[in-house]
Curated annotation (Swiss-Prot):
Coiled coil: none annotated. Belongs to the immunoglobulin superfamily. AMIGO family. InterPro entries: AMIGO, Ig-like_dom, Ig-like_dom_sf, Ig-like_fold, Ig_sub, Ig_sub2, Leu-rich_rpt, Leu-rich_rpt_typical-subtyp. It comes from Rattus norvegicus. Gene3D superfamilies: Immunoglobulins, Ribonuclease Inhibitor. The lineage of its organism: Eukaryota, Metazoa, Chordata, Craniata, Vertebrata. Residues 1-19 form the signal peptide. Glycans are attached at N107, N272, N301, N362, N368. The keyword Cell inner membrane does not apply. It is found in: Membrane. This is Amphoterin-induced protein 3. Residues 25-61 form the LRRNT domain. May mediate heterophilic cell-cell interaction. May contribute to signal transduction through its intracellular domain. Disulfide bonds join C34-C40, C38-C47, C223-C251, C225-C273, C300-C352.
Amino acid sequence: MAWLVLLGLLLCMLGAGSGTSDLEGVLPPDPHNCPNKCVCAADVLSCAGRGLQDLPAALPATAAELDLSHNALKRLHPGWLAPLSRLRALYLGYNKLDVLGRGVFTNASGLRILDLSSNLLRRLRTYDLDGLEELEKLLLFNNRLMHLDLDAFQGLSMLSHLYLSCNELSSFSFNHLHGLGLTRLRTLDLSSNWLGHVSVPELAALPTFLKNRLYLHNNPLPCDCSLYHLLRRWHQRGLSALHDFEREYTCLAFKVAESRVRFFEHSRVFKNCSVAAAPGLELPEEELHTHVGQSLRLFCNTTVPAARVAWVSPKNELLVAPGSQDGSIAVLADGSLAIGRVQEQHAGLFVCLASGPRLHHNQTLEYNVSVHKPRPEPEAFNTGFTTLLGCIVGLVLVLLYLFAPPCRGCCRCCRRACRNRCWPRASSPLQELSAQSSVLSTTPPDAPSRKASVHKHVAFLEPGKKGLNGRVQLAVAEDFDLCNPMGLQLKAGSESASSTGSEGLMMS
């Protein structure tokens, strides 16, 4: 009996083991397996700085960001990104890639950021970047690029930032932009290259939003008058590329490296450059002024009819028919732009981008729209009411003047105040008499040595004055109070004292 139990247990164990092996054959491999020498964190796969000379054999399908920078990779295999359908960012900087090849990005249609900086790339061919329709940022700086195919960036319709600095490029087509479109591109970095010639008309034809971040500093540009006027105008307009790297914009005065001078600091080199040497380099932007709530329509007037017209709003939104996402801006069938009710958010630079087979190059037109708030209407001023009020006040004042008697108490107060004053009244007859009085004596002042008193001011009445006979003396005391004329004292001299009683004082 014990042997039977042991045999049953052995059979069960064998059955369980065979079932487990069958399940292992049916289940797919774990997609979260992390490659050797790499670090996996959620949707991030980092293999940076591991000394890899070849690509990892198995990559997890959940990776949205893959970092392979700071390794020793020399080649990328076609279709190596096929398992990574969610990939959005790929970093391949600081490797030893000298060529890309056909089909290396075929299965990376969702890629947004591609970093190929600090490698050994010498040439970019037309098919090297195929399959990157959604790419927005491409970093190619610090390579050895000497040549770009005419359509090297063909198909990158969503590219907005392109960095090509620190390479060996001696030319660049600003007319064609090597297959790039103007509708999305906002940053173009060509600094620190070997650009010895640039087409000034092609530069001038670029839209302002691209000029704002077009970096051309640290290039052996010639000290050309037309280029000088163009860059100086950009500098005066305050474009970021010129403002941020003002001192790095240099040119060669004598076509030798030792003759490098700064554009905006050595005016003597350009003293013979007149404005007439570069007429019409840029079409001035049209200034438009409108008010909130009004309607606005902008026309893309090109030299010849354009096959394709697009607009760029002040918020860098690409506007094609039917219009903006919020519906406030419409692009009509003729290519014009219409705004039904202007708001403050519509202020800024509108750029029209026109292209077509009949145009020699893509044309741009710019409208700088200023939106003003409507002035509040002043409150209505009721002139009739104010006129009536003024008439009533004037009538009351006239009636008071005509019929209101003066205040007697006020008169008494005025008289009392006048008595208390210490200066003479101008209309007093006694004061007039004192002013015309004279001092007479029996002894005439015939002696020349006789002097009048220095303490009294006297006046002699004319001899012909009637009624005085030259004998009446009016003497006023020095301490006489002019405010109290009743205290006047008449004093007779020693010789005329007896005659004053009989003859008396005669006043008229």
